[in-house]
Amino acid sequence: MKVVAFNGSARKDGNTAILVNAVFGELKKAGIATELVQLAGKKIRGCTACGKCFEKQNNRCAVKGDIVNDCIEKMLEADGIILASPTYFADVSPELKALIDRSGFVAKANQDMFRRKAGAAVIAVRRAGAIHAFDTINHFFFISQMVVPGSSYWNIGLGLAPGDVNHDDEGIMTMRTLGANMAWLMKKIHE
């Protein structure tokens, strides 16, 4: 089994990546392979509402020239998907939102192709707005008919400067619990 995570942060090794790696630690202990895809510095644009995904139904977005179709392929190949983002004005980063919108339309156009995969949101935040960002990701998972594991708290880590989340003991523990629960859920799905 495999989990792919998409880091929507502009900081490759910032708080969001630290939180994802805390989840990955537990997944790896359970024998689940992991892959982290950094959206930072990659070309990615929003949905153009062209509707071609519904016309062609080929598991691909018609917009070319960026990484979205590569990301969709990785999502299809994985058993679990983590979408991770810092909080930008009480929501996910624009790069992650573009991935959600475009992969979401492609999934709907192709018989909910992410159906019954495990999905988990991971949010880094300085102070406020994390719940809305968390909800944005979970709305994508739920409309895609994915299965979402819980944790001991919302999947949020607190910190401003890169590395600050390492001092949020409860946030790191929440990520570890999420990883253990995601591993358990994925094994149950595949029994």
Feature map (PLM): residue ranges:
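Short, glycine-/small-residue-rich phosphate/pyrophosphate-handling segment
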Residues: 94-95, 109-155, 173
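N-terminal beta1-alpha1-beta2 submodule of the flavodoxin-like/Rossmannoid cofactor-binding fold
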Residues: 1-109, 159-191
